[in-house]
């Protein structure tokens, strides 16, 4: 449902222009004057700004929930030398670009809370247990005004962090690193909950509520025609049988309601909530999460299905599925023991049962974020286009559902999920 930023995919058939700022409107307030106090706080020997440049942090059409720019600053220091500093600035979308819908998701309040409170708490828990870990980039500035929330973070690319090409997905080595890091995040969130009580209400809420039923059922009905039309062109054996299994708009929404309901008698974690390849960066053996806007308390099956469905490369997505769960579980057990979890730790068998119980996350992800993950960068892609009624919206939806990369993924996923009883 949420289509977040997509990093360049270095794909030759993409229609991305060479100039990253060609379609970017940079808010006028992002300037030297805004950054000077930040630099004075962050850089002990700061004297002055010599050069200030703002460029797009993502390719055109690849960021649907925020304005995100890379700020490059050359500064003079007290000894007369110069330093080059880089930051990522994220701020709220304007209303006419989808900001009203985004505001309803509490994305920026969640991310503000994660950077200000939760991530520091988690790191402290591990440090008290004698282990230094890192989970996310350093956030150097947070500002909340009536107009919205702004976050300024270190630019991980300056530390040689990179995304993996989303069109290819994660290989086994990267999946292993991510699954272990997810387990570290989840374990700390459980201990934090055990010691400090419930998280803020926004981490228990979702857009799947009765107030939004008409919107979601309308969106589901609107995309159904193009989805089925594209499906019939896929190289999927017994395609008509799979079409019969597609949920109605009401069934789709009811499934979403059930997925977001939390059973507090079960093992729950604070999920990252948007765990796909562009929200994970790598540098050597270091792995960090970015984009903490969708955090949600609930079953770890949410993050696991979302990650595997959206981001494991095609050659291992289904083949290594059970292995992925085992890798995550092994590290989760290690971390929960390290952090002295007082309750029974879920067994591997119990985790697999959770994956089945919450298996609707698989098709929810496959029909949502995966569609966009495998789409080459497109300046015309936007949340408004996705939801637009009429011929233009219909054409766009058919285009994304008939994308050969999406077809290849779904031709694998449909039989896999059917055999698990998840359709």
What function would you assign to each model-found segment?
Residues 67-78, 88, 248-300:
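Active-site acidic catalytic loop and adjacent metal/ATP-binding pocket
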Residues 110, 173, 177-180, 222, ...:
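Generic recognition of stable, solvent-exposed alpha-helical segments in well-folded globular domains
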Residues 55-225, 300-301, 338:
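Conserved ATP-binding subdomain of kinase catalytic cores across diverse folds
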Residues 1-67, 74-84, 196, 243-266, ...:
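Regulatory N- and C-terminal appendages and interdomain linkers associated
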Residues 162-171, 289-293, 306-313:
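Short helix/strand-bridging catalytic loops that position acidic/His residues to coordinate divalent metals
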Residues 7, 160-272, 385-423:
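ATP-dependent phospho-/nucleotidyl transfer catalytic cores
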Residues 113, 117, 294-338, 361-383, ...:
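Active-site activation/catalytic loop segments of kinase-like enzymes and analogous catalytic loops
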């Amino acid at each position: 449902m949420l289509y977040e930023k997509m990093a360049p995919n270095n794909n030759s058939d993409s229609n991305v222009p060479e100039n990253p700022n060609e379609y970017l409107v940079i808010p006028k307030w992002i300037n030297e004057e805004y950054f000077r106090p930040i630099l004075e706080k962050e850089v002990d020997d700061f004297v002055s700004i010599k050069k200030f440049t703002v460029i797009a942090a993502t390719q055109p059409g690849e960021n649907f929930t925020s304005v995100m720019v890379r700020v490059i600053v050359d500064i003079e220091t007290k000894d007369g030398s110069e330093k080059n500093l880089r930051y990522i600035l994220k701020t709220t979308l304007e209303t006419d670009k989808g900001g009203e819908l985004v505001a309803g998701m509490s994305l920026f309040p969640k991310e503000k809370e994660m950077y200000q409170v939760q991530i520091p708490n988690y790191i402290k828990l591990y440090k008290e247990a004698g282990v230094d870990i890192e989970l996310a980039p350093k956030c150097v500035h947070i500002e909340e005004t009536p107009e919205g929330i702004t976050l300024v973070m270190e630019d991980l690319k300056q530390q040689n962090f990179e995304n993996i090409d989303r069109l290819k997905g994660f290989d086994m080595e990267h999946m292993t690193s991510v699954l272990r890091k997810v387990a570290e995040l989840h374990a700390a969130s459980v201990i934090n909950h055990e010691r400090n009580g419930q998280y803020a209400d926004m981490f228990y809420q979702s857009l799947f509520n009765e107030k939004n039923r008409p919107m979601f059922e309308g969106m589901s009905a609107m995309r159904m025609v193009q989805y089925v039309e594209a499906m019939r062109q896929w190289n999927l054996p017994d395609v008509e049988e799979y079409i019969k299994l597609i949920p109605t708009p009401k069934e789709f929404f009811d499934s979403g309601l059930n997925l977001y309901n939390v059973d507090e008698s079960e093992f729950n974690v604070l999920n990252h909530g948007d765990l796909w390849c562009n929200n994970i960066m790598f540098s050597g053996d270091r792995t960090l999460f970015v984009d903490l806007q969708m955090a949600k308390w609930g079953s770890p099956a949410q993050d696991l299905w979302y990650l595997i469905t959206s981001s494991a490369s095609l050659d291992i997505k289904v083949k290594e599925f059970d292995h992925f769960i085992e890798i995550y579980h092994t590290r989760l057990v290690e971390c929960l023991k390290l952090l002295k979890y007082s309750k029974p730790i879920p067994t591997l068998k119990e985790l697999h049962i959770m994956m089945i119980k919450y298996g609707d996350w698989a098709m929810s992800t496959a029909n949502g974020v995966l569609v966009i993950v495998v789409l080459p960068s497109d300046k015309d892609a936007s949340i408004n286009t996705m939801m637009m009624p009429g011929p233009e919206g219909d054409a766009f939806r058919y285009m994304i559902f008939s994308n050969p990369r999406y077809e290849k993924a779904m031709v694998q996923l449909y039989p896999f999920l059917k055999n698990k009883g998840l359709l």
